């Protein structure tokens, strides 16, 4: 995972009211550090070059329809490949019913499997927007903003050195 800010998977599950289809012990404490989400359409065909395992994976109607045309053995092979990468979570959109091979593979690899009733594109854009805010770098500064002759001036300094008192004295 990256070195920047992180967010617990449990927070995302609660925020988006995701249904937990399978969650190994401690799954709520998994840390998410990547602001992007992947739709593993190419991976469902067997292409895993340049696959970013640190992203959450979102399966929608397109991926599900493709898998429906595959045999149970092919589905098992694809899900085994996907879950073997140990991504933070796999989310099924549109309230789609998981294939038995999907559940079996999630348990086999102790992978988190979630579901939302939301439309795939809407959920993806909302989740990415949320992750962008939650995982944005932040910085804390001690300071007070004062107006001097109509211009804003930021007085910065260590905590407790009298910035606010200086501001109050300038008002008097």
Feature locations, PLM:
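Hydrophobic positions on the alpha1 helix immediately C-terminal to the Walker A/P-loop
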Residues: 166
């Amino acid at each position: 995972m990256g070195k920047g800010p992180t967010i617990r998977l449990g927070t995302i599950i609660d925020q988006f009211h995701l249904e937990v289809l399978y969650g190994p012990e401690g799954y709520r404490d998994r840390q998410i550090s990547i602001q992007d989400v992947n739709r593993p359409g190419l991976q469902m065909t067997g292409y895993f070059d340049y696959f970013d395992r640190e992203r959450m994976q979102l399966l929608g109607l397109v991926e599900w329809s493709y898998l429906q045309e595959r045999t149970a053995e092919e589905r098992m092979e694809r899900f085994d490949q996907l879950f073997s990468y140990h991504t933070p979570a796999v989310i099924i959109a549109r309230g789609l019913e998981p294939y038995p091979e999907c559940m079996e593979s999630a348990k086999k690899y102790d992978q988190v499997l979630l579901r939302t009733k939301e439309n795939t594109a809407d959920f993806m854009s909302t989740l990415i927007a949320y992750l962008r805010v939650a995982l944005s770098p932040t910085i804390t500064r001690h300071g007070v903003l004062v107006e001097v002759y109509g211009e804003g001036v930021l007085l910065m300094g260590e905590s407790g050195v009298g910035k606010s008192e200086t501001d109050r004295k300038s008002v008097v």
